[in-house]
Amino acid sequence: MRIVLLTGFEPFDQDPVNPSWEAVRQLDGVQLGSDVKIVARRLPCAFATAGECLTRLIDELHPAMVIATGLGPGRSDISVERVAININDARIPDNLGEQPIDTAVVADGPAAFFTTLPIKAMVKAVREAGIAASVSQTAGTFVCNQVFYLLQHALAGSGVRSGFIHVPFLPEQVAGSQRPSMALDAMVAGLQAAVLTAWHTPVDVKEAGGQVS
């Protein structure tokens, strides 16, 4: 049985839940075909340990595809990331109290890595399921970007496709505010559509997904 590794993060910044893990955990064991299934795992939200945990999972599971997910505060849709950059610049401390500023994710590593997922086909599929989605041009500079960069670095040249998706807050996390959110069932359905499309789409579609500024 081939495996698509799907990861989410533990809660951080004093939130009791992280919607990325709440959504991903519901997809654990879902089959994408007769010989492939999703395996969901949770990563720590810490610069020192998230990458190590991800590496162990890859070594243990030998996945055929890896998609990491995380919370994007302020995001209003399923945001499929295009690029990871070689910089840590934490606005807040991580769960171990560390706050790296302007440090490299990988010393002497490339400035950036592009996703190897069919991101525009994924966005199209999520939208066709009636759920808001877009291509994102930045994964930030916190642990999400670090994990995305380390993932692409680890799998470069392996033939294993990989990438990252950001999800919004859950409604209960932002109750009483104007911050955008998405219901958990919509998030789960959107991620499932994205993962299924990623698995079955070897070549991305050619359509606009950029931004003017």
Curated annotation (Swiss-Prot):
Key words of the record: Cytoplasm, Hydrolase, Protease, Thiol protease
SUPFAM superfamilies, per the entry: Pyrrolidone carboxyl peptidase (pyroglutamate aminopeptidase)
GO molecular function, one term: pyroglutamyl-peptidase activity
Keyword Translocase: no
PROSITE patterns: PYRASE_CYS, PYRASE_GLU
GO BP terms, alphabetized: proteolysis
Pfam family, one: Peptidase_C15
Catalysed reaction equations from the record: Release of an N-terminal pyroglutamyl group from a polypeptide, the second amino acid generally not being Pro
InterPro entries: Peptidase_C15, Peptidase_C15-like, Peptidase_C15-like_sf, PGP-I_bact-type, PGPEP1_Cys_AS, PGPEP1_Glu_AS
One Gene Ontology term, aspect cellular component: cytosol
Entry coiled-coil feature ranges: none
Active-site residues annotated for this sequence: 81, 144, 166
Xref: CDD domains: Peptidase_C15
Main location, first listed in the record: cytoplasm
Subcellular location(s) per record: Cytoplasm
Family according to the record: Belongs to the peptidase C15 family.
Function, in words: Removes 5-oxoproline from various penultimate amino acid residues except L-proline.
NCBIfam families (UniProt xref): PRK13197.1 (NF009676), pyro_pdase (TIGR00504)
Assembly and interaction partners: Homodimer.
Name of protein: Pyrrolidone-carboxylate peptidase
Organism, scientific name: Pseudomonas fluorescens
Gene that produces this protein: pcp
